[in-house]
């Protein structure tokens, strides 16, 4: 299977896993146009769509794609805001699509019903885990989001994270503000700057790299606690407390 990142909007990625015969699994098509263009240029033929959550920039292209390919299968979380013709999938379920097994992982926090898909060594994390960051908690709680991130962090280090947005440089600015002496993080920022200067995606990225550089996955490290503690209104009694304060800090941060 070949992985393709299709840019959409200002900073979204639509992901496509493409078989040798051109049949493809499409993840989070917020726009139809990039998928239609890939079909025109590369002979890509969508056979199924996977949705991680209901936000418009992740599902907005579904109707047009189903008009173009009426037999297109659709899978997403059990949520009334997901297109009604979707097959609902939940935690622990496995899908076999184009001879590839997709494992469904429940990751509430960004939204209450958010899911991720793990397949062929690739983690399609939607807006839960970002390169050097994590999603805002629009509907979930800090304990939920922390648990979701820990669930993803427990996957093999060679797992490639395919998230929904090109946020690496913006997230790097905050991460370095929190963890300025992290040499691996400094290198990642430099690499990401070079990649973006060349108009290349900074994704996918290995989970091993994220574990070394993403502050939201490093709440057990003393340097992260030390950075967060002065901002906290009360004692940080757990990693969840550290995570919650770190997320509040990120919400307020301006580079």
Curated annotation (Swiss-Prot):
Organism field: Xanthomonas axonopodis pv. citri (strain 306)
Gene transcribed to yield this protein: gloB
Enzyme Commission code: 3.1.2.6
Family per similarity comment: Belongs to the metallo-beta-lactamase superfamily. Glyoxalase II family.
Gene3D superfamilies xref list: Ribonuclease Z/Hydroxyacylglutathione hydrolase-like
Catalytic activity: an S-(2-hydroxyacyl)glutathione + H2O = a 2-hydroxy carboxylate + glutathione + H(+)
Disulfide bond residue pairs: none
CC cofactor note: Binds 2 Zn(2+) ions per subunit.
Top-rank lineage group of the source organism: Bacteria
Swiss-Prot/TrEMBL cofactor(s): Zn(2+)
NCBIfam families in the record: GSH_gloB
Record-given protein name: Hydroxyacylglutathione hydrolase
Pfam family for this entry, one: Lactamase_B
Recorded metabolic or biological pathway in which this protein acts: Secondary metabolite metabolism; methylglyoxal degradation; (R)-lactate from methylglyoxal: step 2/2
């Amino acid at each position: 299977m070949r992985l393709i990142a299709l840019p959409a909007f200002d900073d979204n990625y639509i992901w496509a896993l493409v078989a040798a015969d051109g049949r493809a699994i499409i993840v989070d098509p917020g726009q139809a146009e990039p998928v239609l263009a890939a079909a025109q240029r590369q002979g890509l033929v969508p056979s199924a769509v996977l949705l991680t959550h209901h936000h418009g920039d992740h599902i907005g292209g579904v109707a047009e794609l189903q008009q173009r390919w009426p037999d297109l299968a659709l899978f997403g979380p059990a949520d009334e805001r997901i297109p009604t013709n979707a097959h609902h999938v939940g935690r622990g379920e496995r899908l076999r699509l184009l001879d590839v097994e997709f494992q469904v992982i429940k990751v509430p926090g960004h939204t209450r019903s958010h899911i991720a898909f793990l397949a062929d060594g690739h983690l399609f994390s939607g807006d839960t885990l970002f390169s050097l960051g994590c999603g805002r908690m629009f509907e979930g709680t800090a304990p939920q989001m922390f648990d979701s991130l820990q669930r993803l962090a427990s996957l093999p280090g060679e797992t490639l994270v395919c998230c929904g947005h090109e946020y690496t440089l913006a997230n790097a600015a905050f991460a370095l503000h929190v963890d300025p002496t992290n040499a691996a993080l400094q290198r990642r920022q430099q690499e990401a700057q070079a990649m973006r200067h060349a108009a290349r995606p900074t994704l996918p990225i290995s989970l091993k790299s994220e574990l070394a550089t993403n502050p939201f996955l490093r709440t057990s490290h003393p340097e992260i606690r030390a950075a967060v503690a002065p901002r906290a209104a009360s004692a940080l009694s757990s990693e969840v407390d550290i995570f919650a304060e770190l997320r509040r800090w990120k919400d307020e941060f301006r580079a």
